[in-house]
Each structure stands twice: as structure tokens, then as C-alpha cells.
A protein has these predicted regions:
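Walker A/P-loop
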Residues: 123, 128-129, 133
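Switch/coupling subdomain of P-loop NTPase systems
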Residues: 2, 22-33, 42-62
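Conserved ATP-binding TGD loop and adjacent catalytic N/P-domain core of P-type ATPases
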Residues: 119, 132-136, 142
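Conserved beta-strand segments of the P-loop GTPase G domain that flank and frequently precede/overlap
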Residues: 36-39, 67-69
Length: 247
């Protein structure tokens, strides 16, 4: 076999190179959706890190969905649902799953079938365990949580594209767990459109270049004050905007 032609990527998921680097790191290419997996506990989830993943997906114009695994550690899906309601209200499909108890797997299997997905998220949240539970033939290696730092150990050390069984087919890329996630090539003034729940309000700000901080007649701040937009997500926007402006 020989490579005859390299076709352009139709999509990509890119982040800043780790370790404070300034380069671009391609996580996956030619995918249809990004599936961001976090644990309900063990390791403790950090919402701002989840927001970073979602902003990167939005900036790369990729559909995203959220999976909260290990819900058995917090009393089940009903107990976990309220903590993550902000993401459902923002328009993201949210899957509450337990690979251990095989809960919530059918809906996630349906979301993965027939498309090319990339699973990403921190180490130790159960990405490989989820894939093994949904598609037993994959037989992926799984790891444990370090008791000393409450963080996952890497068990997936490279990105792998797995064909999915079944009539609908599809592929899933299982990527190594990430302990840091940096945004790449995103202008600070473009951040607000990467928060779907802010988009309806952006045309109604008095100033076209509104930063949604202290400007008068800011429709975004008015929506937050009225409870129409999550205060936690808005605070995350402000934090991430500050980081982008410092880069």
C-alpha cells in the first residue's frame, strides 16, 4: 500500500499544547461529535474544566454532549441531575451513566451509533469502562484512581479509533485522559458565541463589542440577573475571557 493523496480535514478538535506551550495539539480529526466525559465523583469534577472542553468543541464547530459517569457514587442519576442542569438548559445533551451498574447506557449507545465520536475528558472518569460496558468486544484497559491525589492514572496512552459493532456502525475515538486543557487560537471577543445560552442575547447588547462585564445595557448581564442564564456559567465565561486576554 502507498499513500496516494492526503485529503483535507473536514473537522478537527484542537487544543493548546500542554505544559503552557504555544503550539496547537490536534486531539482528533474528521469527527462528528465530541463526547465530554466527567465523573460525578472520584475524581471530583471541576465544572470550569468541563466548560473549557465545551468551548473548544464550540470553537471547532463540533456538536458536543456531556456524560456524567459514576452516578452511583452520588446516589444515582436523579441525585446527579440537578448539579448538571445548567448544561442541559444550555442545550447540551446530558447523559447520566453508571458503567458499574449499567445505567444510562442504552441512550448513550444510541448517541454513538452511526457517527464518528471522540470521547475526551479528565483521567479516571471511566471513559474506557463506559465503552467496555456499551460495546463489550472492545475490551479496553481500565485503571484506578490514585488515592494520594484523587486523580486518574492514564490507561489510554494514545488515541485509538474503534469501529462500533451493529447495523448502524460508527466509530469512537478513545483519547488519553487530560489533566489540563488549554484553548487554542480563540480570540477573546469570540468567546461569548462559544456559550450557546448567551447567543440569543448578544444582538441586544448596546455595544457590538460588549465584553459583558461592566458595559451599560448589556443584555447578557440582564439575563443573568433575571435568572435566564446560569450565574455559574456566566462566571466561567468571565474567568475564561480573562485568561484569553492575558495570553
Amino acid at each position: 500500500w502507498a499513500i496516494a493523496e492526503i485529503l483535507p480535514r473536514r473537522s478537527r478538535l484542537a487544543r493548546r499544547a500542554p505544559g503552557g506551550g504555544q503550539g496547537e495539539r490536534i486531539v482528533a480529526a474528521n469527527v462528528d461529535q465530541v463526547v465530554v466525559v466527567f465523573a460525578a465523583a472520584n475524581p471530583e469534577p471541576h465544572r470550569r474544566m468541563l466548560d473549557r472542553f465545551l468551548v473548544i468543541a464550540e470553537a471547532n464547530e463540533l456538536a458536543a454532549r456531556v456524560v456524567i459517569n459514576k452516578v452511583e457514587l452520588v446516589g444515582g442519576a436523579d441525585a446527579a441531575r440537578e448539579r448538571w442542569i445548567d448544561y442541559a438548559r444550555a442545550g447540551y445533551p446530558v447523559h447520566l451513566t453508571s458503567a458499574k451498574r449499567r445505567e444510562g447506557l442504552d441512550a448513550l449507545r444510541g448517541a454513538l451509533s452511526g457517527v464518528v465520536s471522540v470521547l475526551t475528558g479528565p483521567s479516571g472518569v471511566g471513559k474506557s469502562s463506559l465503552l467496555n460496558a456499551i460495546f463489550p468486544g472492545l475490551d479496553l484497559r481500565v485503571g484506578e484512581i490514585s488515592e494520594s491525589v484523587n486523580k486518574g492514572r492514564h490507561t489510554t496512552v494514545g488515541g485509538y479509533l474503534h469501529p462500533l459493532p451493529g447495523d448502524d456502525g460508527g466509530y469512537v475515538a478513545d483519547t488519553p485522559g487530560l489533566r489540563e486543557i488549554g484553548m487554542w487560537a480563540l480570540a477573546p471577543e469570540s468567546l461569548d458565541v462559544c456559550f450557546p445560552e448567551l447567543r440569543p442575547y448578544l444582538p441586544h447588547c448596546r455595544f457590538a463589542d460588549c465584553r459583558h462585564q461592566v458595559e451599560p445595557d448589556c443584555a447578557v448581564r440582564a439575563a443573568v440577573a433575571a435568572g435566564e442564564v446560569s450565574g455559574a456559567r456566566y462566571e466561567s465565561y468571565l474567568k475564561l475571557r480573562g485568561e484569553l486576554e492575558e495570553q
